From Swiss-Prot:
This is Large ribosomal subunit protein uL22. GO terms for cellular component: cytosolic large ribosomal subunit. The gene is rplV. One of its GO terms (molecular function) is structural constituent of ribosome. PANTHER family: CHLOROPLAST 50S RIBOSOMAL PROTEIN L22-RELATED, LARGE RIBOSOMAL SUBUNIT PROTEIN UL22M. Gene3D superfamilies: Ribosomal protein L22/L17 (3.90.470.10). Transmembrane segments: none annotated. Keywords: Ribonucleoprotein, Ribosomal protein, RNA-binding, rRNA-binding. The keyword ATP-binding does not apply.
C-alpha cells in the first residue's frame, strides 16, 4: 500500500527542488526528516511539508505503520512559468522566467 502527497505551483525551479529530493529518495521517513531539517536549502522546507502530509495520509487514510515507512518515489515536475520582463538600457527588455514546480512524494511500507 502507498500514500502520496503533492504540492502544486510551488514558486521554485524544479531543478532546485530535485537537488533536495535526491537526498531523501529511498530513505526511511525518520531519516528523511532529520536530513531535511538540517539541509540549508529553501526547497527543504517545501519537501518537509510534503513529506509530513504524505506520512499523515498514510497514517489516517491507509492505517500504515509510520515506523516502517520509506520514500518510494520523489519527483518534481515543471509547473506553469510566470513570464516577466525587466527593463534594460536603450529601450531593451530582458525576459525573466519565474518557474514553478509540482512536488510529489510517495511513501510505502517496508516489507
Amino acid at each position: 500500500m502507498e500514500a502520496r502527497a503533492i504540492a502544486k505551483y510551488v514558486r521554485m525551479s524544479p531543478r532546485k527542488v530535485r537537488v533536495v529530493l535526491d537526498l531523501v529518495r529511498g530513505k526511511n521517513v525518520s531519516e528523511a526528516f532529520a536530513i531535511l531539517k538540517y539541509t540549508p536549502k529553501d526547497a527543504a522546507t517545501v519537501v518537509l511539508k510534503v513529506l509530513k502530509s504524505a506520512v499523515a495520509n498514510a497514517e489516517n487514510n491507509f492505517n500504515l505503520d509510520v515506523n516502517k515507512l520509506y520514500i518510494a518515489e520523489a519527483y518534481a515536475n515543471q509547473g506553469p512559468t510566470l513570464k516577466r520582463f525587466k527593463p534594460r538600457a536603450q529601450g531593451r527588455a530582458y525576459s525573466i522566467m519565474k518557474r514553478t514546480s509540482h512536488v510529489t512524494l510517495v511513501v510505502k511500507e517496508r516489507a
